[in-house]
C-alpha cells in the first residue's frame, strides 16, 4: 500500500480528519504526504481529542481501521501503525487512559508489548 492509498483509506474511514489533513498537507505533498507523518502529527493528537471528548463512534471507526492495518499483510501499513501511531501514543499518553477499553484485540496486544 502506498502513502496515497493509506491516506485515502484513513480519510474515508474518518472524514472528520479532512480539514486537519488538508491544512497540514497543503504545504507538503497533499494526499501523497507520507503516512508516517500523517499518523504521528495528525492522527495521534486527533485520537487523544476524541478519547477525551468521548466521541465513541469516531473512536470505534479509528481503532477498527488501525486493527485492519495491523492484521493486514501489508508491511507498510503495519509499520505506520506501530512506529507512527502506537509508539507515540504509548510514549506520550500510555499512562493517561485505559486503552484496553478502546483498542481492539490485536491493536491492544501490540500496544501492550511496546516498552518505554
Locate the predicted segments by residue.
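N-terminal leader/targeting peptides and immediately adjacent processing regions
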Residues: 1-16
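Alpha-solenoid HEAT/Armadillo-like helical repeat scaffolds in large eukaryotic proteins
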Residues: 5, 9, 27, 68-69
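Extended alpha-helical scaffold segments
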Residues: 20-21
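HEAT-repeat alpha-solenoid elements in large eukaryotic scaffold proteins
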Residues: 35-46
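Core helices of alpha-solenoid repeat scaffolds
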Residues: 59-63
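Amphipathic alpha-helical binding modules
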Residues: 75-116
Amino acid at each position: 500500500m502506498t502513502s496515497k492509498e493509506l491516506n485515502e483509506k484513513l480519510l474515508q474511514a474518518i472524514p472528520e480528519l479532512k480539514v486537519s489533513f488538508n491544512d497540514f498537507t497543503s504545504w507538503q505533498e497533499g494526499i501523497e504526504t507520507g503516512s508516517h507523518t500523517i499518523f504521528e502529527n495528525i492522527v495521534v493528537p486527533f485520537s487523544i481529542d476524541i478519547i477525551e471528548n468521548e466521541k465513541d463512534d469516531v473512536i470505534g471507526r479509528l481503532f477498527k481501521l488501525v486493527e485492519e492495518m495491523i492484521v493486514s499483510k501489508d508491511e507498510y501499513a503495519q509499520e505506520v501503525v506501530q512506529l507512527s501511531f502506537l509508539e507515540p501514543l504509548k510514549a506520550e499518553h500510555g499512562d493517561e487512559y485505559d486503552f484496553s477499553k478502546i483498542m481492539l484485540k490485536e491493536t491492544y496486544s501490540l500496544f501492550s508489548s511496546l516498552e518505554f
